[in-house]
Amino acid sequence: MAGVEDWISAPLAVVQGLFSQRQANGDWEKNVTDYFHDKLQGNRSPASVPCLNDVPLHYLKPNSLVRFRCMVQDMFDPEFYMGVYETVDTNTSARVLHFGKYRDLAESLPQQEVDLDSRRNVTCERQTFYCVPVPGESPWVKDAYTSSSQARACASTSYTPSRQKRSYEEDEDVGPCDTRTSHGLGEPKRLETEAAGLQQNQPSSCSSAPDLNFPLPGEKGPACLIKVYEGWDSFKVNDIIEVYGILSVDPALSAVNEDRDAVSALLDPSDNMETLEEQRAHCPPASLVPRIHSVVTWKLQHNNPLLPGTLQGTEESKLFVSNLLCEVSAVRAELLGFLSHALLGDSLAAEYLIIHLISTVYARRDVLPLGKFTLNLSGCPRNGIFSELLYRILQQIVPAAHYLPMTIENMNKLRFIPHKDYNANRLRSGLLQLSAHTSLLLDETLLEQGQLDTAGVHNVTALGNLITWQKVDYDFSYHRMEFPCNINVLVTSEGRSLLPSDCRVHLQPQMTPPNLEQYMGALLSASLPSLLNKFRSYIGLLRLLDYSISDEITKAVEDDFVEMRKNDPQSISADDLHRLLVVSRLLSLSSGQTTLSREMWLRAKQLEQQRKSRFREQKHVNGNEL
C-alpha cells in the first residue's frame, strides 16, 4: 500500500493497490471511494490537499490529488469509458488487467497492447460537468480560503513542470500543435479510455481560443471539466460543489492527431458524431481547462469559509452555532450601526437591509417561492456613485455579489439569459446564471432616456421573473426551461423602480458627506477585520436557521390582522399580511430567534408603519412618484 502522504501526491498508486487487492471481489471501486472519504474526514486533511482555486495550474503535479471549489455551469452528455481493460504482452502473450477509472488515457508498457475484444473488458459510464469558479465570489472569501490552505499547499507546489510555463494568454495563441504520439521511446503507451462511439478528446484546431464561459464579465480563475463517476444525479446546474479528484493535464488530451491508427485509438472516427465546434467546446486545451477525475464530491450548503461545512450533526457545528447565537444581539446592533452609516444615517433603511441580507428561499409552494425578500431602496442619488459604493460595502460582508448598472446600453447589449448552443452542444452562460445566496444589486439610478430593443425587453422581463418567481427561463431555442434560483436582489432607484419588489423603502439621508467616496472608504477602514468577520458569520448563519410559528401565535396574528382590517379596510390588504409575516419572520431570525414571538410581531408592525409613513409625508421627489 502507498505511503502516508502518497494518497495526495500519487493517488493512482493507491487506486492501483486497491484494484490489485480487490479486483477479484469486484468491490475495488467502493474500497477506493471509502479510502479517500476516510482520509478526508479529519479536520486538517481537506486543507492539506492543494486547491486549484489558489495554486496556479503549472505548479500542480499531474495525476496528483487536488480540490476545486466551483459552480456547475453545464452538464455534458454522459460518456462511456473502459473501466477495466486487458493488455497482451507481444513478447510473452501474458495478459494483465488494468483499471481505466480516474484516467483519460490508458496506461500500458511499450510491449503491451490493449485487447479490444477481450471479454474481461468492462465498459462503464461517467458524467462530465463543466465547472467555473463561483461567480461573483467576494475577495474576502477567496482570501479566507487561500489563507486556510496556503501553508499546507506549499509542499505540493514544489513540483517542477517539465515544460516551460505559459500564461493563459499564451496558451490561447499557440501555433501549430505538436502531434507527436504520447508514447515515445522508453515511455509507457497511453491509450484513450473512452469507448467507441463517444467523445474524442481532440479539438479540431488549437489556434482558436476557447470561451471559458464565465457567467460574469471580468471573472478570472480556472475552468475545469469534472469527470463524475458516482451519484451525479444528486447534482444540478448552478450547484456549488467542492471536488476532490485526480488532476489530468496530459497534452494528448488537446493535441490534434489526424493520423491516429487503429492500434493507438480506442475510438472509431467513423462513429464519432461530434461537430468540429462541439469538439472545441468539449475538448479545450488541458492547459486552459484541466480535467479532474472526481474521487469525492460534496455539494456545499454555502460558500462562507467562516462557517462549518454543515450546521447539522457535528459537535463543532453545534458549538459554533451556540457561540454565535449567544452574541447575536450585540452583533446585530453593530451591524445596524454599520449599515446605518453606509445608508447616510438612515436606521430604518438599515433595518430593512439587514432582513434583506439574511433572506433566503426556504421552500416553494407550487410556483411561489417562500422566504424571498427583494428590497427596492428608492430615493437614492441619481449619479450612481452612491449605489456602487453601497455595493462595495455589501461585498465586504456577503460571500458572493454582483453590481449591474441598468444603463440602456447594458440592457440592450448584455446577455442575461443562458442559452443552449446546439452547434457546440453546450450551455452558453448569461449574467443571471448565479449560485444560491448571491447578492445582486441592480442600479436603476443610471437608467437614462432611450429605447430598449427586443433583447433589452427580454432582459427586463428576465429580471422581473427572477425577482417575482426566483427563476430564470433558460433559452433552449425551441422552448424555455425554468431553472429555480435563490438570489438576493437589491434595487436602488431614484423614484419607484420599474421592476417589482417585495418591499420598498424610501431613503431619508441624515447627512450629506462632501466626498461620498472618501466617507465610505473611511467607514470600511474604521471597521476591524474581526468585526467584519462577525458580520459575515452572522449573515451566513441566520439565513440557514430553521423557523417555525406556534399555533398560539398563529391565532393571535390572525386575530390582530382581522382587527387591522376593521380599523383601516382601505389600506390593509392580503399583501400587507404576507409582507408582515415575512418581515416578522426575518426580524425574529435577525435576533437569533427561531420562532415568532408577540414582541417581534409588534416590532414588525411598527417598522411597517414607519416605512409607509414616509410615502405619506412626501408623494413626489424630483418629479418621480414615490
Swiss-Prot record:
Nucleus recorded as keyword: yes
S-S bonds: none
Domain of life: Eukaryota
Main location: nucleus
GO CC terms, sorted: nucleus
Cellular localization per UniProt: Nucleus
One Gene Ontology biological process: cell division
GO terms of molecular function: chromatin binding
Region listing for Disordered, in residue ranges: 159-187
InterPro entries found in the cross-reference section: MCM_complex-bd
Keyword Repeat: no
Assembly notes: Interacts with the mcm complex: associates with the mcm3-7 complex which lacks mcm2, while it does not interact with the mcm complex when mcm2 is present (mcm2-7 complex). Interacts with mcm7.
Task of the protein: Associated component of the MCM complex that acts as a regulator of DNA replication. Binds to the MCM complex during late S phase and promotes the disassembly of the MCM complex from chromatin, thereby acting as a key regulator of pre-replication complex (pre-RC) unloading from replicated DNA. Can dissociate the mcm complex without addition of ATP; probably acts by destabilizing interactions of each individual subunits of the MCM complex. May also be required for sister chromatid cohesion.
Family: Belongs to the MCMBP family.
Name under which the protein is recorded: Mini-chromosome maintenance complex-binding protein
Biological source species: Xenopus laevis (African clawed frog)
